[in-house]
């Protein structure tokens, strides 16, 4: 878990560094920032890093040989496969994030347009070009290469030659990415809304309508947040932004690159299909054990976490990896879930960390 943040419009390194400082709890292993003045306004990017792969390398922001800049939060599970397919790219790191820049260079950079000063119109809380929501908009050209990524991510990529900022989230929206447009047209974005508080022009106001929806349905129905004019970048979505002649951020494109529809099978054969399901889950666990640091499993004692813990053991044994430790928290040593977790940990000979919380501590 890293923390990324940035500004397109009225900002500087002092402000973006403070914004990133508000996310230091997400990434204590390193900090980096980038600032570039534009004709009017500026682009600022920053990251607080939690190092998981390529511990001593892969510092961010990462700059590519085609002069694009990236900050990313997440993991790209198929980065080794992508690296093997893009052999002519001058790799600077052994980490996973750089594959985003390599794909951008190969599929988007060579056929890109020249920079044109956008004409934006205020639509709700945003400033958009007239074609931003139409097929063939600026974000559409990135669908093919982003679709090659397998993982979880929220990233921001700045292309200085056409002054284009790409904001993107993974298909399931595992990694967060929020944005807001200030009254002067400045775009703020980050892994947490908390980062916006460091910008002197941001004013946190409640969104009463969004709050009412949460209370009624207990989950959001759209991409609004409890803060007025602060929204999430949608899962499986690419947004492209640029800056106009007045230094205001303009949305030039928005597109979904992933719209998979998962429907229940009409006929379920447990003798055949259960093995397919288990193999898929095994492959998913195998991908998520990609790490240069120790990995652990939170073991509640329920079916889901028990499956993950058991498969982690099997994957580790087959790959010669260190078996992940498991952790269980309960309010009582005789809690049924704790007993189930102990039983599973003993069965698989897992290093089990048990924490009993005294109920009196809650008062």
Language model: regions and residue ranges:
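ATP-dependent adenylate-handling active sites, centered on carboxylate activation for C-N bond formation
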Residues: 8-13, 87-88, 106-115, 119-120, ...
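N-terminal glutamine amidotransferase
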Residues: 1-71, 75, 107, 116, ...
């Amino acid at each position: 878990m890293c923390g990324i943040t940035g500004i397109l419009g009225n900002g500087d390194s002092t402000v973006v560094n403070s914004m990133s400082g508000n996310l230091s709890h997400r990434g204590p292993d390193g900090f980096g920032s980038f600032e570039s003045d534009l004709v009017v306004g500026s682009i600022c990017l920053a990251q607080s890093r939690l190092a998981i792969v390529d511990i001593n390398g892969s510092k961010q922001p990462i700059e590519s040989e085609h002069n694009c800049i990236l900050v990313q939060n997440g993991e790209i599970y198929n980065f080794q496969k992508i690296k093997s397919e893009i052999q002519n790219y001058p790799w600077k790191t052994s980490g996973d994030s750089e594959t985003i820049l390599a794909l951008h260079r190969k599929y988007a950079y060579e056929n890109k347009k020249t920079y044109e000063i956008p004409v934006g119109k205020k639509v709700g809380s945003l400033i958009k070009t007239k074609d931003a929501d139409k097929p063939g908009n600026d974000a559409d050209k990135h669908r093919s290469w982003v679709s090659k990524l397998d993982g979880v991510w929220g990233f921001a990529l700045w292309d200085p030659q056409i002054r284009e900022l790409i904001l993107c989230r993974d298909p399931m929206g595992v990694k967060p990415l929020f944005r807001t447009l200030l009254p002067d047209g400045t775009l703020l974005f980050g892994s947490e809304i908390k980062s916006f508080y460091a910008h002197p022009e941001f004013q946190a106001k409640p969104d009463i309508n969004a709050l009412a929806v949460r209370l009624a349905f207990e989950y959001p129905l759209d991409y609004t947040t409890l803060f007025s004019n602060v929204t999430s970048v949608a899962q499986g979505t690419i947004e492209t932004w640029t800056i106009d002649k007045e230094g205001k951020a303009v949305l030039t494109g928005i597109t979904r690159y992933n719209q998979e529809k998962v429907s229940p099978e009409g006929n379920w054969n447990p003798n055949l299909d259960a093995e397919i399901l288990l193999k898929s889950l095994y492959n998913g666990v195998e991908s998520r054990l990609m790490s240069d640091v120790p990995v652990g499993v939170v073991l509640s004692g329920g079916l889901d976490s028990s499956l993950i813990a058991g498969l982690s053991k099997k994957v580790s044994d087959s790959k010669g990896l260190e078996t992940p430790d498991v952790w269980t928290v309960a309010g009582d040593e005789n809690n049924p879930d704790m007993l189930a977790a102990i039983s599973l940990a003993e069965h698989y000979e897992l290093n089990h960390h048990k924490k009993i919380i005294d109920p009196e501590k809650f008062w």
